[in-house]
Each structure stands twice: as structure tokens, then as C-alpha cells.
Amino acid sequence: MAKIQMKTPLVEMDGDEMTRIIWKMIKDILLTPYIDLKTEYYDLGLEYRNETNDQVTVDSANATKKYGVAVKCATITPNAARMTEYDLKEMWKSPNGTIRAMLDGTVFRTPILVKGITPYIPTWTKPITIARHAYGDIYKNVEMQVKAGSKAELVTTDANGNETRELIYDFANEDGIIQGVHNRDKSIASFARACFNYALDMKKDIWFATKDTISKKYDHRFKDIFQEIYDNEYKEKFEAAGIEYFYTLIDDAVARVIRSEGGYIWACKNYDGDVMSDMVATAYGSLAMMTSVLVSPDGVYEYEAAHGTVQRHYYKHLKGEKTSTNSVATLFAWTGALRKRGELDELPELMKFADNLEKATIQTIEEGVMTGDLAALSTLENKQKVDTEEFLLAVNERLQKLM
């Protein structure tokens, strides 16, 4: 059988620990036998990031801007223990954070649904995608503990040196705390465009929610920017695609989400998205069954799994023990990237391959062959728990039939 050809390379970002092992297995078992795989390779493993003073991360982000589609393996974000373990020159930043900032991207996370793993919320029969704004709010805050007798004010100084002051609170007789947060119109607009573009791409409704009734300047600004961009740039496109943009208050949104059947994109401010993406992932069953894609406002895509490097399994692997590590989210990162590359380069064969590989993966699990984490969740009667490699080989058997 002739291999499927590619025109433009994918930007390939390798990673760390068990996911790095799985990365190679996926390529060897499921990709290179079928595709003449073209990638521009960047090793984002912690050792090479350390060796290059993290320049490799910057280079990979620039390559993603150039080519438009990337696929990324999970990577270690170092802490004090990793500093010692890897003898690092310094505590390098999160590669995801660096890439997200360079692409000005929004992260979209979507659960992968399979029969036998029922969401904890029975009405959820379709996936809910969480879109999280990745800039500002409490993540770039300034905080202070305040002593009694202090007065806290919000002060801005304009270009001409003129000050505007607002009293926050007069801590006349008591200690307390204060926090300053900010956001930028440009970042909010980028977030809005990424959300609207992704909704058009996926042909799904989009919901957005803030607390603008209480936060009449801060949250209201988010609401206004979204509405303005929607009305001026996207309304006609949405109507033509038969999808809608829906705004409501965050508390109403949560109630509606719980009652809904799913099947839409839920755009959230930074903190809301941080919290709700974990809630949604857990309610659907597993972080290892979540896809994650970073989308820039100018249409650059970076696909990855929503989970970490599976350190515990990696240490077992190093001892020569078999592991039963779930590879589904990593596999779907590859299929997402290949499908998008096929779409951009007008390669229907490549898109069909990505579809077939996803079908084969879901079919494998629904026929009872799965890794240990899914076996613990699945309600199927005849389950077979397999190791990491056996699962990929089982997927390959089904893929061959679909081809």
C-alpha cells in the first residue's frame, strides 16, 4: 500500500517521561507505516531545554507561526525537585506558557466520549469544550496584606501625569487583604476572535459568561468586546453556519451547563476556565480522555494532550516493568494535527486517515480492550486490561480493517 503523502511539515514538539515513550510508539505503530510523515522536529524534553537555555521552546513556537500547525507531547514544568533530578541551570518556565504567550493563543479542551464510560452528569451526551482565556486576572495579580490604620486606593496615572484615585477600603480598625488585577482590551479581543473562529471551525454554538451585573467595568468590558466583535465580524458567518453566540451570567451559565446535553463551546475568563475545565474533565471521566488545542487569533493551531508526563509510570518503565498508560489523548493530538494539516493543504486522504485512526481507537475501547485507568471506569462487562503497547497494537488491528 502506498503511503499517504504530505505537502507541508507538521511542527513536532517531543516531550518528557512516559509520554515521550508513548509518542515514539504512536509514530512507529500507527503513523509511519501509513503516512510519509513530514515533521519539523523540536526536542522539548527537559534535558534539551536545559542544554539550549530554553531557546528550543522559542524556536518551536516560531516554527508553529511559520507552518500553522503543531503537535506537542506533554512536557515537565520544573519545580525544586526537578531542579535537582535533572541538574538544571535554572527553573525553566512552562513550555506551554511560553508557546501560549508567543502565539497569543486560547486553549480549547474537549472530552473524548466512548460507550461504557458514562459521564457523572447523565444529561451530558455530547462533549462540552472549555475555552479558557489565558491572560491576566488573578494570574497576573498584585496582592498585599494590609495593617489596621491603612487606607487602600486604586490609583492610575495617565500619560500627562494626572492621577485618578478610587478608595478601595479604609482599614481604620482592622487588618485585611487587597488584590489588584488587570486585563488588556487587545488580549480580550484576541480571545474573542479565537473563540468565534474555533466555533465556526467546529460548527458549534458558543456560550460566554461573566458577572457583569456586579463587575460593571471589569467583567462588563469582556461582555462588550465579545459583543462588538461578534456583531461586526462574525454575526453573518454564524447565521450562515447555523450556529449561535449566547451570553449569560456565570451563575446562570453553570446551571444551564449542568442541565444541558452538551455539544457547545463554553468560553470562560481565566479563573473560571481553570476551575471549570477540571470540573468538566472529571465529570466526563478522565483527564487522559481530553483533547487540548491552542488556537491563535490568526488561525495557528497547536494540538496536545490535556494531561502531564505520567511520571509514576515512567519510573516503572525505567525499571523494565510493563505499564498500562492511557495514550488516547496523545493519539488524538496527532489525529487533530494531521486532520488540520490535511484540511489546510487540501489532502482528503490525510483527513480520512485521521478520522479512521480516531474511529479505530474508540472502537478498541468500546470492544472492551483498554488500559487500566479506563478499565476501572468502564461499565462494559467483558473488559480486557492491556499494557501501553498492546493497546496501540489493538488499535492498529482495527485501523488496518478501516483502511
Task: Give the predicted meaning of each segment.
Residues 46-60, 223-264:
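N-terminal small/polar loop signature for handling phosphorylated ligands or for N-terminal nucleophile
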Residues 2-8, 18-23, 27-52, 61-64:
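N-terminal alpha-helical transmembrane segments of multi-pass membrane transport
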Residues 6-25, 154-248:
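Glycine-rich phosphate/diphosphate-binding loop of Rossmann-like nucleotide-binding domains
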Residues 134-135, 140-192, 199, 344-347, ...:
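Glycine-rich phosphate/pyrophosphate-binding loop and the adjoining helix
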Residues 36-41, 202-210, 234-247, 342-354, ...:
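Flexible, glycine/charged-enriched surface loops at secondary-structure junctions
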Residues 257-356, 363-367:
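Glycine-rich phosphate/nucleotide-binding loop
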Residues 47-164, 271, 275:
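N-terminal glycine-rich phosphate/adenylate-binding segment common to multiple enzyme folds
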